[in-house]
């Protein structure tokens, strides 16, 4: 899919109001990733992906050393060490079996993957050493690949995005020029 950034941002601002530069940068990165990703062929599904990122990054995060909310950038889950560890340490369902795994494998990215199992799984599928270096999930291209693969293949919930938002022939081709 191809997007006209000027048109996109004009419509975005009409619907949602002004954007900070860090938000423009984040959305621009997402638009570029979406254009380069042949997996997304539906504007409606892509809209859902963008909305998910908006929700997942709206809790705030640090971008270029500055705390911001609604970042549209890959972020590290916010929370104190104590909070994160109380929620993730020792969680067998996440594969957090080693001391410190709760903190090491806390949420990161556009969709906040958590747990040793998820970092290992996505790292293997993408050919990226996520289990060895979880901060790689903060790179926009890796964060997008996790989001795309997870949604389209059903790796987050067991259901594919098309189970929720089905693809219809010719519907979206009329929406994208």
Task: Walk through the language-model features, giving the residues of each.
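Peptidoglycan-targeting cell-wall enzymes and recognition modules
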Residues: 2-29, 51-151
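Extracellular/periplasmic catalytic domains that process cell-envelope and extracellular macromolecules
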Residues: 4, 40-45, 103-106, 139, ...
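Ordered core of a single globular domain
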Residues: 29-35
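Short polybasic/polar patches that bind polyanions
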Residues: 35-36, 124
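Surface-exposed patches in mature extracellular/periplasmic domains of secreted proteins
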Residues: 36-49, 63-66, 157-170
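Acidic helix/loop microenvironments that form the catalytic cleft of cell-wall polysaccharide enzymes
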Residues: 53-57, 162-177
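A residue-level signal for beta-strand positions that form part of recognition/binding surfaces
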Residues: 110, 158, 175
């Amino acid at each position: 899919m191809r997007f006209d950034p000027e048109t996109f941002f004009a419509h975005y601002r009409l619907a949602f109001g002004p954007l900070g530069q860090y938000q423009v940068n984040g959305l621009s990165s997402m638009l570029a990733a979406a254009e380069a990703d042949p997996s997304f062929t539906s504007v409606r599904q892509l809209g859902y992906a963008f909305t998910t990122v908006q929700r997942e990054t709206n809790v705030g995060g640090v971008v270029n050393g500055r705390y911001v909310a609604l970042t549209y950038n890959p972020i590290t889950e916010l929370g104190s060490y104590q909070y994160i560890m109380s929620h993730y340490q020792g969680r067998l369902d996440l594969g957090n079996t080693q001391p410190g795994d709760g903190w090491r494998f806390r949420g990161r990215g556009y969709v906040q993957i958590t747990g040793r199992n998820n970092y290992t799984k996505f790292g293997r599928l993408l050919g990226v050493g996520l289990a060895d270096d979880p901060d790689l999930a903060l790179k926009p291209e890796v964060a997008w690949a996790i989001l795309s693969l997870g949604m389209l293949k059903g790796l987050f919930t067991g259901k594919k995005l098309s189970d929720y938002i089905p693809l219809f022939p010719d519907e979206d081709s009329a929406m994208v020029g």
